[in-house]
Amino acid sequence: ETESFTYNTIYKNGFKIIFLPITEILNRPNSKEFINYVAPVKEKRNQFINFCKNLKQKEKCDLFILSVHANDTEYTRDVTENQEKWYMQLLDCGIDIIWANHAHIIKDRKIVIDKNGAQKIIMYANGNTISGQRTNPNFTEKNVDLERDNTGDGLLYLVELKKSPNKIQ
């Protein structure tokens, strides 16, 4: 079975941008036919990687952005080894920016230099832009169980890109 995913093509400031949103979790299993769902299992992830490789080759875009509603534990700042491996595979298949979220709190982010010298970005989780999850926060104690108190924090990014032959900086 070949999966198909919907995506947007955006033309902005001389860039051709592919924006592809996916989710790895479903609140209702019967809704997967209406959204870009990638089950967090090896077979489905490999199919998705092949889809992305083919899409990048077909569209010849300057920038490929993937938005991931990640199969990730909420309220934890840890980036798992499996998550790191998965995101590196996605960068290797041609994605330039991974914009992941699910934890509801801020996680780390990093810039990766690929084999051609291009800079790629992974944002593991940017918190909540708007949140109603925080009630009676307690910031005075160092307690892992209180990470939910950090759900009121969120990041917005300004990323400046420059086109060079064969890469984006």
Regions found by a protein language model. Name each.
Residues 20, 65, 102, 124, ...:
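Divalent metal-coordination and catalytic microenvironments
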Residues 87-88, 95-134, 148:
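Glycine-rich, Lys/Arg-enriched anion-binding loops that position phosphate/diphosphate groups
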Residues 61-94:
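Active-site-proximal segments of metal-dependent phosphoesterases and phosphodiesterases across multiple
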Residues 2-3, 10-14, 57-59, 114-118:
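Extracellular/periplasmic catalytic domains that process cell-envelope and extracellular macromolecules
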Residues 1-7, 26-29, 71-76, 98-112, ...:
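Active-site environment of divalent metal-dependent phosphoester hydrolases
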Residues 22-25, 71, 127-129, 164:
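Solvent-exposed coil/turn segments that connect beta secondary-structure elements
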Residues 12-64, 83-85:
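Binuclear metal-dependent hydrolase catalytic cores centered on His/Asp/Glu-rich metal-binding motifs
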Residues 133-169:
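A short C-terminal boundary segment appended to hydrolase-like catalytic domains
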